[in-house]
Amino acid sequence: ILSGLVGSEMCIRDSFHWDYPTGLLDRGGWLHRDSPAWFADYTAAVAQRLGDRIQDWMTLNEPQCFIGLGYGSGIHAPGQKLPVRQQLKMVRNVQLAHGMSVSTLRAVCARMPCIGWAPVGIVWYPHTSKPADIRAARTATMACEKNHLFNNTLWSDPVVLGRVAPEARRAYGKLLPKYSDGDLRIMAQPMDFYGVNIYQGTPVKGGKKGKAQPVPFAPGNPRTAFHWNVTPESLRWGPKFLHERYGLPVFITENGLSNTDWVAEDGRVHDPQRIDFTRRYLRELRKAVGEGVPVKGYFHWSLLDNFEWAEGYKQRFGLIHVDYQTFRRTPKDSYYWYRDVIRRRGQGI
């Protein structure tokens, strides 16, 4: 399978998508001071086996989720609810693990690696094209709030810019663990792209003193089966603001729609909502490209209906329908549409 994917230039390695060895979890997991070294050892083992064939690598996927939801709200495994101070210690260890993983890949891979990571993109986008709204959206996109970890700059400033974000210092204050100069040097290994998972955003307008004011969604605003608001603009402004901040090419590592899909009497799966969703989002991404954002690529989530960590098999994200009783796979209408989009290299969307 790997050789076939490599031959088709469709191979990118996601090194960590949340499954964590129980033995290491029992020793403290991401709270343990040696957890970055454990991850570097794992990276070395994988790179020794696959580094001659895989060129593109992501170190960690959605760290806001596996820490914030796994150890903050407890919605995801391992289902713990820890104080923010302890979660922030985990953040630092995750950032160290990322940096050590990047260094390991560059040292071990036989093929020159192209490396990034893939945090969640927290996007606030301007309600109108007014400069005040754009400024407010940019500021909100980079902001941090003290009660949770779902933001951009707490995570990415140390690994890209080699500093603790000013927004994080203001929000968390004394709750932040110490970041030594040596820590920041380890974290801020050169990356080749900034991966980001974007599904939705929040519209804002400029309020008093430039403060961002969220704009309520109109009644009946389109929502996914996951109850996420459909906001195509987020795929324009998110990459734009993140590129302004970090200066790296952007890779959309996840974007897609959870929909209510089933096999119709004609044996097909008709999902016009997914086609419309993807078309609208890709059009906005094209606007970002036209405005100078170097977009390296786009991954649709997902190829197959899949298992979601907290939702199980309730949410169907796939371009291919999976019958979970028989495991029969049925390409949806969106599968054929997206295939043609790829063949046309995005022309005509």
Label the predicted regions:
Residues 8-9, 28-61, 95-108, 175-186, ...:
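An active-site-proximal structural segment forming one wall of the substrate-binding cleft
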Residues 72, 81-84, 167-265, 270-273, ...:
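Glycoside hydrolase catalytic-domain groove-lining segments
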Residues 1-7, 12:
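Single conserved hydrophobic/aromatic residue that forms the stacking wall/gate
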Residues 92, 99-104, 117-180, 201-202, ...:
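Glycan-recognition surfaces
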Residues 77-112:
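Active-site neighborhood of glycoside hydrolase catalytic domains
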Residues 16-27, 47-81, 114-122, 296:
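Active-site groove signature of glycoside hydrolases
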